[in-house]
Amino acid sequence: MAAKDVKFGRTAREKMLRGVDILADAVKVTLGPKGRNVVIEKSFGAPRITKDGVSVAKEVELEDKFENMGAQMLREVASKTNDTAGDGTTTATVLGQAIVQEGAKAVAAGMNPMDLKRGIDLAVNEVVAELLKKAKKINTSEEVAQVGTISANGEAEIGKMIAEAMQKVGNEGVITVEEAKTAETELEVVEGMQFDRGYLSPYFVTNPEKMVADLEDAYILLHEKKLSNLQALLPVLEAVVQTSKPLLIIAEDVEGEALATLVVNKLRGGLKIAAVKAPGFGDRRKAMLEDIAILTGGQVISEDLGIKLESVTLDMLGRAKKVSISKENTTIVDGAGQKAEIDARVGQIKQQIEETTLDYDREKLQERLAKLAGGVAVIRVGGATEVEVKEKKDRVDDALNATRAAVEEGIVAGGGTALLRASTKITAKGVNADQEAGINIVRRAIQAPARQITTNAGEEASVIVGKILENTSETFGYNTANGEYGDLISLGIVDPVKVVRTALQNAASVAGLLITTEAMIAELPKKDAAPAGMPGGMGGMGGMDF
């Protein structure tokens, strides 16, 4: 086991505080409409330019192990806030730094760290309750666009696009952000359920110009195994032919004799038909087939359920008003499923999303939820160069997360004003002087975001904060973008409550742990062994006669 270096008390806290300051100082320059960019070196390719707090925090790795521990703990504040609210990472970092700095001073003055932490927690709970009480619910598309615009650093086009996407696919729908191949940023909305499997044979195409197979008012057969034997399939095909309706077959695979017969029947015009592979793999494939069955009002034909393909009747097949199949994708629009059953399935998937701990699983479950609940919108972010596209994509991601958070818990006045006002409303009382000091730490610390936003704009923070607090209106504040005071909500300068609340709770949680640290342990760097000397020369060859 390697030897360890242990630091105690004040020495440990000073090192840790230095790490916190280095990380926070790099992150906080990005805060607000006049925040600056940070350039990050990449081991390959062009450097990355970003204004996204968590992206900056993730890149900071310090040489000194004790300083690095402080920086990594503050990085955790940004990461946790990003995971929960998707935005507000810079605000969380600024709050974390402010609480740690104030707390370290109090501990150095001889106060009890545990009581300070209790005081901090008391005050934070009161501020959170105050924010939730003041929250204004979002109702209109314009308000959604305002939140998106603020988070995208004042770019109205992005705000509008997000509002439009949310209007089309609903709050449950999935909105994905991709890099465009062109310089333009555009929005594409897919109605209904789409999955990434195309037709198994180009002979199924009904529109040769667009190379798509369109089936109107179609039956849908869902089978979880491979289909290669024609005999088992015949009863279903005969029943569908009688109805003169098209048929879509979704199975693990359709091959051999079965596929050849389907193609021949399609070409002869006796049967409008198309076949695609089922989406996903393993258990996820079963779940997605079940989703399609519920959406279309059909059943999955599965040996597990004791249903054989030969005994399938028309009422076991799903129905949809329109099915469109391209080379890569299949879209099912207007399935005939019961609304109550779809809602129950949506509820079940939401429950799974809450319970899962893996990001990948959560992402896949959210995709399934969107396909059932609304649809999918794709925002393709364009730009002149790759560096610009990446920077813009960061902002669109933040804006999208902020907008979702705003719809969930409502909005408050932006620009750090909501926290600034809350600092004057804290009435909590500690049971001793040290807890009172903890409450006062929060009073001062929650002014930090508003001060940092004005500092980044080159203004005098104390003057502006004083002027805002002189006015008694909850929504009165300073618009850093144009240097004017006014009603921030009507100006569209708003913050989602969930983002502000999460930032404060995470900052206080980690800062409380840092303040109460009394010892730090890190591995000592390994000393390189001295290089071995060169071997000695050969001895003399004495005593040899020639």
From Swiss-Prot:
Which Pfam families does this entry report, sorted A to Z?
Cpn60_TCP1
Residue spans making up a coiled coil are: none
GO cellular component terms, A-Z: cytoplasm
The source's domain of life comes to Bacteria
The UniProt keywords, alphabetically, are:
ATP-binding, Chaperone, Cytoplasm, Isomerase, Nucleotide-binding
Which coarse location class applies to the principal site listed for this UniProt protein? Answer: cytoplasm
Entry GO MF terms: ATP binding; ATP-dependent protein folding chaperone; isomerase activity; unfolded protein binding
| Assembly notes | Forms a cylinder of 14 subunits composed of two heptameric rings stacked back-to-back. Interacts with the co-chaperonin GroES.
Q: Which NCBIfam families does the protein's record reference?
A: GroEL (TIGR02348), PRK00013.1 (NF000592), PRK12849.1 (NF009487), PRK12850.1 (NF009488), PRK12851.1 (NF009489)
The name this protein carries in UniProt is Chaperonin GroEL
Q: Which gene encodes it?
A: groEL
